[in-house]
């Protein structure tokens, strides 16, 4: 049977003539400059920032000449996550993570901006004059002077937007617009409505009932009449799902038809710039006509009042009259799904207090006008008069979370779609000047997923070559350490824990090569002072100096006489037998009030052979921790022991300092859980300050993990040294502290924006996924909430 439908080729109707120097030229001599737009990430923008973005759009649009069309086009395409399994060095758990997210659907957002210079006649053409309806298109010539002025205005437009610091424009090249042999271009993608890389040109069917592109059926909802708009528009709106009575989550006014609409769709936003003065003069004339006809009809009188209000607004505030149009073009290859999509689009428009208008008549011409570079073909009857400020309120202003452009990082998950993200919170922020160190401060109440997140982070750092030293108080890392030990055949994954049968044992005087640098000697001296003095005792310069001299003399002794076994026992014997005699024979006597060696020996007796704690500093195993990449010190059973806890902590810190100094060019990570409380003693204050300020110079980072805010407040040393020198702050669910969060906010120096983000954690979690949310703030300037979601295999590793 013969097809009686009218047919034509795309080539005959194609409205574009050429793309030269990155400019799209139509057959009607309209010239278009195309940009890719980089918008801020979803849930990370405040009301004030939305107003700033809005102000920049308005300012930029005003630099364009008359008879221009600003066409902002947001693409939202459903895609499936493709796991990265091709890397050779991936661990079993990393592969499990990738497989867990295999083919997970998500909505990919791309935003483009087309600035088109047309003519007065073209700007007022109606749909029946569209290039889609004309039999022949006769090319016209471009005016050189007009083109030059327009391109200069486009450069100003780009500069204004980029100077905002919130939105970034990047001009598209010719290859990106038309494509190459190996990659499809923007125009090809539009005609196929397919994701990037999958493009094949499709037949386009225009009928009275529907429009089809290949197998896809289109549905179009338009905002083309002022009566369809809400009574009031704004730059942003409150997102109730993630807001509390103490915090606001803000989204752009048009966000319901953006990322929150989970179907394949394109959101087109048009601002058509006419001669504002001429437009206002026409309205003045129309108002006079309405006035003269008001006696015949009340509607004429009402219309005159509306026109007067519009004119008064324009003249009072110096506003520019423009025309605008907005439409949501959605599609599906399934008829039933399309019905649901129509309902979804309608309900999302209704949530903006707009009147949903399903447009079936103008679908082909509006689709045609939305071709990149063909905005001048827009039918004038589909637009309504407004001002720039109101029109821009209906722009979408946010996008998906972005991956970090860095080879190093951890895998987190987009909280909206559940798509895995590559996130660098150590190196890239320092490179960009967002942070000045890699240190991190982690705060999360019990049950908030703190250990869950830390296990996830630590494993990935270790797999990327980092040396990790952990001080734990709850067996949180036992499973991970055991897995590493089994995988390396016992070569790595050292787990120290205290039991009565096998207590923790160290040897601070042991080194493989008998090399003791200044830091090593200082750490031994600090350890000995801690053994000797209580927290309340003040250490004098004489005591510190004499003990330092004794340590240096003992080290010289063991270096020259290798028959002496380095240990606390032999050091104690050296102090008791040799150093005490040398002290007594000096010409300048050292008074007991200045340095009481007998008191020191008596106090330290319990750590010497036969004493209560003779096991602690006299280990015979002599494990070289320098080469071990994953070390866990589990000290839960001694955390309340005032004798052992500070000593063990100092030894651990000394081990990390040794790594920090001697391992050049290797990432080092010290993670201290609740054990950090012991570091706040008077003897350790300077040591702590030194480590936190110095670790960044040695490619290292210190991470403190706690669940109690009060502990931080009570320690000025911790407050000053840890918080002030941790540019990366990580907070988990704080809703149980909501009523006293102002105190946390003041302590951590959080902004209102960061407070709102933190209080939104876990408020709107997807019940079909198992995950916990976490807030990560970098340098007080960049922050977002991410999801920690892992595979079943990773869950099984945890104890």
Model segments located where?
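Conserved P-loop NTPase motor cores
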Residues: 426-448, 452-459, 468-478, 494-502, ...
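Short, flexible loop/turn elements at secondary-structure junctions
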Residues: 39-41, 74, 117-119, 332, ...
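Short secondary-structure boundary/capping segments
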Residues: 85-90, 127-132, 373-376, 483-488, ...
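Conserved P-loop NTPase
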Residues: 752-799
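Extended, folded cores of ATP/NTP-driven motor/assembly subunits in large transport
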Residues: 1-398
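Short glycine/proline-enriched loop/turn "hinge" motifs that connect secondary-structure elements
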Residues: 23-29, 102-107, 316-321, 413-415, ...
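P-loop NTPase motor domains
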Residues: 47-63, 258-262, 271, 354-355, ...
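The start of beta-strands in P-loop NTPase/AAA+ ATPase cores
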Residues: 31, 109-111, 467, 629, ...
């Amino acid at each position: 049977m013969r097809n009686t439908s009218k047919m034509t080729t795309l080539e005959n109707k194609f409205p574009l003539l050429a793309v030269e120097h990155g400019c799209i030229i139509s057959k009607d001599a309209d010239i278009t400059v195309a940009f890719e737009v980089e918008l801020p990430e979803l849930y990370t923008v405040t009301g004030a920032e939305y107003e700033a973005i809005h102000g920049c759009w308005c300012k930029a649009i005003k630099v364009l000449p008359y008879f221009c069309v600003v066409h902002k086009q947001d693409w939202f395409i459903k895609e499936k996550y493709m796991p990265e399994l091709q890397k050779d060095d991936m661990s079993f758990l990393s592969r499990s993570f990738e497989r867990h997210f295999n083919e997970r659907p998500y909505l990919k957002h791309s935003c483009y901006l087309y600035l088109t210079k047309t003519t007065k006649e073209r700007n007022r053409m109606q749909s029946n004059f569209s290039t889609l309806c004309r039999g022949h298109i006769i090319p016209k010539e471009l005016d050189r002077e007009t083109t030059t002025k327009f391109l200069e205005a486009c450069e100003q437009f780009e500069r204004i937007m980029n100077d905002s610091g919130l939105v970034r424009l990047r001009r598209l090249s010719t290859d990106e617009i038309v494509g190459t042999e190996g990659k499809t271009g923007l125009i090809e993608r539009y005609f196929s409505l397919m994701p990037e890389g999958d493009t094949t040109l499709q037949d386009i069917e225009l009928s009275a009932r529907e429009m089809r592109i290949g197998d896809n059926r289109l549905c179009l909802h338009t905002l083309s009449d002022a009566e369809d708009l809400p009574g009031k528009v704004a730059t942003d709106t409150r997102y109730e799902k993630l807001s509390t009575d103490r915090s606001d989550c803000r989204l752009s006014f048009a966000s319901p038809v953006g990322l929150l609409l989970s179907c394949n769709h394109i959101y087109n936003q048009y601002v058509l710039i006419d001669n504002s003065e001429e437009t206002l003069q026409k309205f003045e004339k129309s108002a006079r006509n309405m006035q003269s006809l008001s006696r015949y009809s009340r509607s004429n009188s009402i219309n005159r009042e509306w026109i007067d209000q519009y004119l008064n607004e324009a003249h009072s505030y110096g506003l520019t009259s423009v025309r605008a149009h907005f439409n949501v073009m959605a599609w599906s290859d399934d008829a039933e799904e399309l019905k649901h999509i129509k309902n979804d689009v309608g309900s999302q428009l209704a949530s903006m207090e707009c009147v949903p208008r399903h447009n079936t008549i103008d679908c082909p011409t509006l689709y045609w006008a939305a071709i990149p570079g063909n905005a001048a073909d827009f039918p004038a009857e589909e637009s309504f008069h407004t001002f720039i400020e109101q029109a821009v309120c209906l722009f979408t202003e946010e996008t998906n979370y972005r991956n970090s452009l860095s080879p190093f990082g951890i895998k987190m998950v987009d909280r909206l779609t559940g798509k895995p993200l590559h996130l660098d919170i150590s190196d890239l922020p320092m490179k960009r000047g967002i942070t000045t160190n890699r240190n991190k401060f982690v705060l999360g109440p019990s049950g908030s997923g703190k250990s869950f997140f830390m296990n996830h982070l630590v494993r990935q750092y270790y797999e990327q070559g980092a040396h990790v030293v952990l001080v734990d108080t709850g067996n949180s890392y036992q499973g991970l350490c055991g897995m590493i030990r089994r995988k390396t055949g016992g070569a790595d994954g050292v787990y120290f824990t205290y039991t009565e049968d096998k207590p923790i044992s160290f040897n601070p005087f042991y080194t493989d090569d008998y090399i003791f640098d200044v830091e090593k000697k200082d750490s031994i001296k600090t350890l000995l002072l801690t053994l000797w003095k209580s927290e309340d005792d003040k250490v004098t310069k004489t005591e510190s100096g004499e003990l330092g001299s004794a340590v240096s003399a003992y080290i010289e002794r063991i270096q020259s006489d290798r028959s002496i076994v380095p240990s606390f026992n032999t050091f104690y014997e050296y102090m008791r037998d040799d150093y005490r005699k040398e002290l007594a024979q000096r010409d300048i006597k050292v008074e007991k009030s200045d340095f009481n060696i007998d008191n020191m020996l008596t106090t330290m007796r319990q750590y010497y052979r036969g004493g209560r704690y003779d096991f602690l500093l006299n280990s015979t195993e002599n494990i070289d921790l320098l080469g071990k990449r994953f070390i866990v010190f589990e000290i839960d059973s001694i955390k309340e022991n005032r004798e052992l806890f500070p000593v063990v902590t100092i030894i651990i810190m000394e081990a990390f300092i040794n790594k920090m100094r001697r391992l050049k060019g290797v990432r080092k990570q010290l993670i201290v859980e609740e054990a950090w409380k012991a570091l706040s003693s008077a003897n350790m204050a300077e040591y702590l300050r030194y480590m936190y300020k110095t670790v960044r110079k040695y490619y290292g980072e210190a991470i403190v993990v706690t669940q109690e805010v009060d502990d931080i407040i009570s320690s000025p040393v911790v407050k000053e040294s840890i918080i002030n020198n941790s540019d990366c702050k990580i907070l988990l669910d704080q809703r149980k502290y909501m009523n006293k969060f102002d105190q946390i906010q003041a302590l951590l120096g959080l902004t209102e924006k960061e407070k709102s983000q933190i209080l939104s954690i876990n408020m709107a979690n997807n019940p079909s996924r198992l995950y916990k949310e976490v807030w990560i703030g970098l340098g007080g300037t960049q922050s977002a909430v991410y999801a920690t979601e892992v595979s079943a295999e990773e869950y099984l590793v945890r104890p």
